[in-house]
Regions:
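Positively charged n-region of N-terminal signal peptides that target proteins for export
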Residues: 1-4
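C-terminal motif of bacterial Sec signal peptides marking the signal peptidase cleavage site
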Residues: 15-16
Length: 178
């Protein structure tokens, strides 16, 4: 009898030790992506206010929330009074008008709890003219014209083009993404 009980317990234990399958996520090509401009999404324009809207997005069938750039915006050469999200001043900080890093982390945690994925728009081609990389890096981090002036894309006077021929720029980008 003891051997039978032991065998049953051993079998149950062995069966209960198998790993549960991870929940299957919908293939990306079938996903509903919602682009969110945090500044304009709610009257408050913050992560905390946007977080309150995540259940509604999940109910609408959204799978992925794509946040427009969330980094501080440069001031030099600024277009308009608010500036362009794509004129990144510092890749390693959160735009304070949206809240804190903790507010962002809470937003992402709530999105994940609701089964939503979050994508953060990464601005890889350029920074603002007054970005920490412009003032704190060698001049060869940026594309230069024949006179040695930083180049800009089209009429985007608030975005200085990065020089990807410099491998340090590649390393800097990889480091900022961590």
């Amino acid at each position: 009898m003891k051997k039978t009980i032991f065998a049953i317990c051993a079998a149950l234990l062995a069966l209960s030790c198998t790993q549960a399958e991870a929940p299957k996520q919908q293939p990306l090509e079938n996903s509903v992506v919602y682009e969110m401009n945090v500044r304009q999404y709610t009257p408050a324009g913050t992560f905390a206010a946007a977080q309150e809207e995540l259940p509604r997005l999940a109910e609408m069938g959204v799978d992925i929330v794509w946040l427009m750039p969330i980094y501080p915006i440069g001031v030099e050469g600024r277009k308009g009074t608010l500036g362009s999200y794509y004129a990144v001043k510092n890749y390693c900080e959160i735009n304070p008008e949206f809240g804190t890093l903790e507010d962002f982390d809470n937003f992402v945690a709530e999105a994940h709890r609701l089964g939503l994925r979050v994508i953060v728009d990464w601005v890889a081609n350029h920074t603002s003219p007054d970005a920490v990389w412009v003032t704190g890096r060698p001049a060869d981090w940026y594309e230069r014209d024949a006179e040695g002036n930083t180049t800009f894309t089209a009429d985007w006077s608030d975005t200085a083009n990065l020089n990807y021929e410099n491998k340090d720029v590649w390393a800097g980008m990889a480091g900022a993404m961590r």
